[in-house]
């Protein structure tokens, strides 16, 4: 699917974009 939060992440980091969560290896909209 799509992930409108254009950010990569690791399990120990939080996504800087508000309303997004980390689902390794990218951030997804909540």
Curated annotation (Swiss-Prot):
Cross-link (Cyclopeptide (Gly-Asn)): 1-30
Disulphide bridges, residue numbers: 5-20, 9-22, 15-27
Signal sequence, start to end: none
Top-level division of the source organism's lineage: Eukaryota
InterPro entries tied to this protein: Cyclotide, Cyclotide_sf
Keyword S-adenosyl-L-methionine annotated: no
Tissue specificity: Detected in stems (at protein level).
PTM note: This is a cyclic peptide.
Gene Ontology biological process terms in this record: cytolysis in another organism; defense response
Key words of the record: Disulfide bond, Knottin, Plant defense
Function: Probably participates in a plant defense mechanism. Does not display any cytotoxic activity towards K562, HeLa, MCF-7, HUVEC or red blood cells. Does not bind to phospholipd membranes containing 1-palmitoyl 2-oleoyl phosphatidylcholine (POPC) or 1-palmitoyl-2-oleophosphatidylethanolamine (POPE).
Entry's family note: Belongs to the cyclotide family.
Notes on the domains: The presence of a 'disulfide through disulfide knot' structurally defines this protein as a knottin.
Protein name: Cyclotide hyen-C
């Amino acid at each position: 699917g799509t992930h409108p939060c254009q950010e990569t992440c690791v399990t120990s980091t939080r996504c800087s974009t508000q309303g997004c969560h980390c689902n390794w290896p990218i951030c997804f909209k909540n």
